[in-house]
């Protein structure tokens, strides 16, 4: 294997991606991409700040304190305390994924990985980083992270093999964003991307019991990407062949039967991967959203109410059924990965927002009654990325059917600016004071004009919370 014919280091995909990261400036970004980046940064920071009160975040923070790691200069969002930049990336990344509020369609959850790494890197940049520079770094992070997943043949084959792509692909995006913030040169950035392979990992075993480590995948990826950039800045080397079709390479290891190596560089600088990322309107796995939306759409179109429903049949592909067809409602993580619970919560409480997933809501007797009306038909003819067909039969015998190919929040069916800001204020308001929520929203919405992101945004994230009660998950 050591005798394989190798591509010269400066001609590898890793090297070309590094040069792309270094040479790209804000002026290279289409206006629509820059504006979309502002929305996703707002959404990601909102998710991470809300996640400050998640049980996973609390346990992780307590663990770091117990290990003597409880001090530093980088803010833990919404917690009023600071740790080292590396530990802040770990905690804030974990918090960003803790409530299933984070965006999706990137590496899968690019925002929960890239944004915490980029914010933490501000503490180590040694200079003020403008909003335009920060946006550029984040866009590049989303781009590299998604390219990693597409090089595996896209979401379905890689995740279907048992790998959680947020953890396997995310570190490369975090490394790219951090390298850009830190001002690394092309050689250092190439090494950072290679080093990030050491932090690539994460399995879907958590789907079977709702284990908390799914949340850790985002935090570990954020921390690993930042560490990769810092190591490269100090002269540590990473394998240049990481993205080549060689033994031990990323594609060869994680996608031996589905690899698409050309995806690393395909339409580089033309097809910005942020463009395909979705913002979540519901606090559950994205694979549950089309079923929620389908029922909502049928109710809106035909005017029936939840208590008129006799049965809901969901015709679904085997991949999504295996991931989200379960009926466990405890712990909360399991409920958020359950189509039956998510649809039932939407029907019983009027939405599948975070408030619909508390322990009290999950134990509402109406939930069990409604979930009992939902059944599945697994259709092996459907492709892994096909959205389900939803059939609703009413007690009076009427039946309706629909399929939502692009759930709410997708680029072609986006949430409005008003809805996005409402979500932000709702979830961040669980932690910060109304004045701090307003200040943070104002800074983030005007991020393009900000001259020093650390001073004007990170400072607010480090303020003491107005509410400290841990979310009852």
What are these regions (language model features)?
Residues 123, 180, 300:
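Short polybasic/polar patches that bind polyanions
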Residues 111-120, 170-177, 223-227, 288-290:
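Well-ordered alpha-helical segments within folded domains of soluble proteins
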Residues 165:
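Active-site histidine-anchored catalytic micro-motif
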Residues 126-133, 150-162, 172-192, 205-215, ...:
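Active-site cavity-forming subdomains of large catalytic enzyme subunits
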Residues 138, 142, 190-193, 438-442:
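Short, well-structured alpha-helical segments that form the helix of a local strand-helix-strand
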Residues 1-110, 206-208, 213-473:
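Terminal-appendage/accessory-domain detector
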Residues 195-203:
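Flexible glycine/proline-rich, aromatic-decorated loop/lid segments
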Residues 92-153:
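Hydrophobic alpha-helical hairpins/lids featuring a short glycine-rich hinge
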């Amino acid at each position: 294997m050591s005798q394989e014919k190798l591509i010269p280091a400066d001609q590898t995909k890793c090297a070309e991606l590094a040069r792309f990261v270094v040479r790209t400036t804000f002026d290279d970004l289409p206006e629509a991409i820059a504006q979309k980046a502002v929305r996703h940064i707002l959404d990601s920071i909102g998710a991470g700040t809300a996640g400050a009160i998640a049980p996973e975040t609390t346990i992780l923070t307590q663990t770091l304190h117990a290990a003597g790691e409880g001090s530093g200069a980088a803010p833990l969002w919404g917690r009023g305390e600071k740790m080292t930049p590396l530990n802040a990336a770990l905690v804030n990344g974990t918090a960003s994924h803790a409530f299933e509020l984070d965006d999706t369609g990137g590496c899968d959850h690019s925002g929960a990985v890239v944004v915490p790494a980029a914010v933490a890197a501000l503490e180590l940049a040694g200079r003020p980083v403008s909003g335009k520079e920060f946006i550029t770094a984040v866009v590049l992070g989303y781009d590299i992270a998604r390219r990693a997943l597409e090089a595996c043949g896209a979401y379905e084959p890689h995740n279907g093999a048992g790998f959680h792509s947020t953890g396997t692909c995310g570190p490369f995006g975090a490394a790219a964003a951090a390298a850009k913030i830190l001002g690394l040169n092309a050689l250092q950035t190439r090494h950072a991307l290679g080093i990030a392979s050491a932090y690539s990992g994460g399995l879907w075993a958590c789907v079977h019991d709702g284990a908390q480590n799914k949340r850790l995948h985002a935090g570990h990826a954020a921390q690993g990407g930042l560490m990769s950039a810092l190591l490269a800045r100090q002269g540590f080397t990473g394998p240049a062949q990481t993205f080549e079709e060689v033994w031990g390479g990323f594609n060869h290891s994680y996608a031996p039967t589905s690899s698409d190596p050309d995806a690393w560089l395909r339409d580089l600088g033309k097809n910005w991967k942020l463009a395909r990322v979705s913002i979540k309107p519901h606090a559950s796995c994205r694979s549950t959203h089309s079923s929620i939306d389908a029922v909502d759409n049928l109710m809106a179109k035909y005017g029936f109410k939840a208590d008129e429903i006799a049965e809901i049949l969901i015709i679904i592909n085997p991949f999504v059924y295996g991931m989200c067809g379960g009926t466990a409602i405890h712990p909360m993580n399991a409920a958020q990965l359950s189509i039956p619970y998510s649809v039932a919560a939407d029907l019983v409480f009027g939405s599948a927002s975070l408030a619909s997933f508390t322990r009290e809501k999950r134990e509402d007797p109406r939930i069990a009654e409604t979930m009992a009306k939902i059944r599945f038909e697994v259709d092996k003819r459907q492709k892994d990325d096909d959205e389900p067909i939803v059939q609703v039969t009413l007690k009076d015998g009427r039946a309706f059917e629909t399929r939502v190919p692009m759930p709410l929040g997708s680029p072609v069916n986006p949430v409005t600016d008003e809805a996005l800001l409402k979500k932000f204020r709702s979830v961040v308001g669980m932690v910060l004071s109304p004045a701090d929520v307003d200040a943070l929203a104002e800074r983030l919405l005007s991020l393009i004009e900000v001259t020093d992101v650390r001073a004007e945004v990170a400072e607010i994230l480090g303020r003491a919370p107005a509410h400290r009660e841990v979310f009852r998950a």
